[in-house]
Protein backbone atom coordinates (compact mmCIF):
# COMPACT_ATOMS: atom_id res chain seq x y z
CA UNK A 1 0.00 0.00 0.00
CA UNK A 2 1.39 3.36 -1.01
CA UNK A 3 1.05 6.70 0.67
CA UNK A 4 -1.92 8.64 -0.74
CA UNK A 5 0.03 11.92 -0.68
CA UNK A 6 2.71 10.42 -2.88
CA UNK A 7 0.07 9.04 -5.24
CA UNK A 8 -1.63 12.45 -5.51
CA UNK A 9 1.72 14.12 -6.21
CA UNK A 10 2.54 11.57 -8.92
CA UNK A 11 -0.87 12.04 -10.55
CA UNK A 12 -0.27 15.80 -10.70
CA UNK A 13 3.09 15.20 -12.39
CA UNK A 14 1.63 12.77 -14.93
CA UNK A 15 -1.26 15.05 -15.98
CA UNK A 16 1.03 17.69 -17.52
CA UNK A 17 2.85 15.30 -19.88
CA UNK A 18 1.46 14.11 -23.20
CA UNK A 19 2.92 10.61 -23.56
CA UNK A 20 1.80 8.53 -26.56
CA UNK A 21 0.83 4.89 -26.18
CA UNK A 22 3.73 2.70 -27.28
CA UNK A 23 5.37 -0.57 -26.28
CA UNK A 24 8.50 -2.62 -26.82
CA UNK A 25 9.32 -3.03 -30.50
CA UNK A 26 8.13 0.42 -31.52
CA UNK A 27 10.55 2.89 -33.05
CA UNK A 28 10.40 6.13 -31.08
CA UNK A 29 11.99 9.56 -31.35
CA UNK A 30 12.69 11.43 -28.12
CA UNK A 31 13.42 15.16 -28.02
CA UNK A 32 15.91 15.41 -25.16
CA UNK A 33 17.04 18.71 -23.64
CA UNK A 34 20.80 18.85 -23.21
CA UNK A 35 22.42 21.50 -21.07
CA UNK A 36 26.02 22.41 -21.88
CA UNK A 37 27.37 25.17 -19.69
CA UNK A 38 24.84 28.00 -19.79
CA UNK A 39 23.35 26.90 -23.14
CA UNK A 40 20.53 24.42 -23.67
CA UNK A 41 19.59 22.64 -26.86
CA UNK A 42 17.25 19.88 -27.96
CA UNK A 43 18.70 16.70 -29.42
CA UNK A 44 16.63 13.96 -31.03
CA UNK A 45 17.35 10.36 -30.08
CA UNK A 46 15.68 7.79 -32.32
CA UNK A 47 15.74 4.05 -31.82
CA UNK A 48 13.80 0.92 -30.97
CA UNK A 49 12.18 0.72 -27.56
CA UNK A 50 13.46 -2.59 -26.19
CA UNK A 51 11.96 -2.36 -22.68
CA UNK A 52 9.47 -0.47 -20.56
CA UNK A 53 9.90 -0.68 -16.83
CA UNK A 54 8.17 0.65 -13.73
CA UNK A 55 4.96 2.55 -13.23
CA UNK A 56 3.82 6.04 -12.41
CA UNK A 57 6.40 8.81 -12.47
CA UNK A 58 9.24 6.33 -12.06
CA UNK A 59 8.55 4.65 -15.39
CA UNK A 60 11.57 4.24 -17.69
CA UNK A 61 12.16 3.07 -21.23
CA UNK A 62 15.28 1.61 -22.78
CA UNK A 63 15.92 2.78 -26.34
CA UNK A 64 18.49 1.11 -28.60
CA UNK A 65 19.90 2.56 -31.79
CA UNK A 66 22.74 1.59 -34.09
CA UNK A 67 25.46 4.23 -34.19
CA UNK A 68 28.57 4.69 -36.29
CA UNK A 69 30.51 1.55 -37.26
CA UNK A 70 27.44 -0.59 -36.43
CA UNK A 71 27.85 -0.16 -32.69
CA UNK A 72 24.68 -0.51 -30.64
CA UNK A 73 23.90 2.35 -28.26
CA UNK A 74 21.34 1.97 -25.49
CA UNK A 75 20.04 4.72 -23.25
CA UNK A 76 17.57 4.53 -20.40
CA UNK A 77 15.16 7.46 -20.19
CA UNK A 78 12.75 8.28 -17.37
CA UNK A 79 9.53 9.00 -19.27
CA UNK A 80 8.31 11.78 -17.00
CA UNK A 81 11.69 13.53 -16.75
CA UNK A 82 11.82 17.27 -17.41
CA UNK A 83 14.67 16.67 -19.86
CA UNK A 84 12.32 14.86 -22.27
CA UNK A 85 10.30 17.40 -24.24
CA UNK A 86 8.48 15.11 -26.65
CA UNK A 87 8.08 11.44 -27.50
CA UNK A 88 6.99 10.54 -31.03
CA UNK A 89 6.17 7.04 -32.28
CA UNK A 90 7.76 6.62 -35.71
CA UNK A 91 6.55 3.08 -36.48
CA UNK A 92 4.91 0.20 -34.66
CA UNK A 93 6.81 -3.05 -34.42
CA UNK A 94 5.39 -6.57 -34.45
CA UNK A 95 7.01 -8.45 -31.57
CA UNK A 96 5.89 -11.16 -29.18
CA UNK A 97 7.97 -10.20 -26.15
CA UNK A 98 7.82 -7.40 -23.60
CA UNK A 99 11.61 -7.19 -23.30
CA UNK A 100 13.70 -7.33 -26.48
CA UNK A 101 17.13 -7.87 -24.97
CA UNK A 102 17.83 -10.59 -27.56
CA UNK A 103 18.37 -7.80 -30.11
CA UNK A 104 21.75 -7.15 -28.48
CA UNK A 105 23.08 -10.40 -29.92
CA UNK A 106 21.72 -9.85 -33.44
CA UNK A 107 23.43 -7.83 -36.16
CA UNK A 108 22.47 -6.43 -39.54
CA UNK A 109 19.21 -7.52 -41.12
CA UNK A 110 18.55 -10.07 -38.38
CA UNK A 111 18.05 -7.21 -35.91
CA UNK A 112 15.18 -5.71 -37.92
CA UNK A 113 11.65 -5.72 -36.55
CA UNK A 114 8.67 -6.23 -38.82
CA UNK A 115 6.13 -3.45 -38.95
CA UNK A 116 2.79 -4.05 -37.26
CA UNK A 117 -0.09 -4.13 -39.73
CA UNK A 118 -3.36 -2.64 -38.62
CA UNK A 119 -6.52 -4.54 -39.52
Curated annotation (Swiss-Prot):
Keywords: Ribonucleoprotein, Ribosomal protein. GO terms for molecular function: structural constituent of ribosome. The keyword Protease does not apply. Transmembrane segments: none annotated. The keyword Kinase does not apply. Belongs to the bacterial ribosomal protein bL19 family. This is Large ribosomal subunit protein bL19. It comes from Sulfurimonas denitrificans (strain ATCC 33889 / DSM 1251). The gene is rplS.
